[in-house]
């Protein structure tokens, strides 16, 4: 998949160094619920074990070809937010040097198009932990509406319990937002 500034493609073993460059930053992973990576080998294991699954994409800069983040659609069986075949959960992160440039909303919009048009989803869910205002803003910019907040969400990779927020965007809402221009294509 492509956008104006990005290519979204499957993760490859050769992406481990790029992944490590951003995943080692304590400002990136922990706020999303996963610990900073300790070395390139851990990043390679993550590519092979976590990021190498269907509907998980490396976000690459068209200008440099380098990986700058990750985005995924977690389908039935790999998400706690739905048990339906026509619903999925969106997950994403982007390296700190790329924060504030509008790249993540750009990637999310393309993945939403893919979810609704190519995969036939009727609803996409997304969550964020309290304090992750950047993730909240990405969801708002892309048309997601908050559905509920849970005071105690288990964050197993961090061995913590946090407050979590869950948002949703239906296919009808997405289409309406595109039609009236409230969310850019």
Whereabouts are the PLM-identified features?
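Conserved GNAT-fold acetyl-CoA-binding loop/helix
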Residues: 27-48
């Amino acid at each position: 998949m492509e956008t104006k500034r990005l290519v979204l493609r499957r993760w490859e073993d050769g992406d481990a160094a790029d992944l490590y460059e951003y995943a080692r930053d304590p400002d990136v992973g922990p706020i999303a619920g996963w610990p900073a990576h300790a070395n390139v080998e851990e990043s390679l294991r993550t590519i092979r074990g976590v990021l190498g699954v269907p509907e998980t994409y490396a976000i690459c800069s068209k200008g440099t070809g380098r990986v700058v983040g990750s985005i995924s659609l977690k389908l039935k069986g790999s998400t706690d937010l739905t048990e339906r075949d026509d619903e999925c959960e969106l997950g994403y992160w982007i390296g700190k040097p790329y924060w504030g440039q509008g790249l993540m909303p750009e990637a999310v919009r393309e993945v939403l198009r893919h979810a609704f048009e190519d995969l036939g989803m009727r609803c996409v869910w997304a969550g964020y932990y309290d304090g992750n205002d950047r993730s909240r803003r990405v969801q708002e910019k892309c048309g997601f509406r908050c559905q509920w907040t849970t005071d105690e969400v288990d964050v197993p990779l961090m061995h913590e319990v946090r407050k979590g927020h869950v948002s949703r965007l239906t296919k009808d809402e997405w289409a309406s937002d595109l039609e009236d221009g409230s969310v850019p294509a």
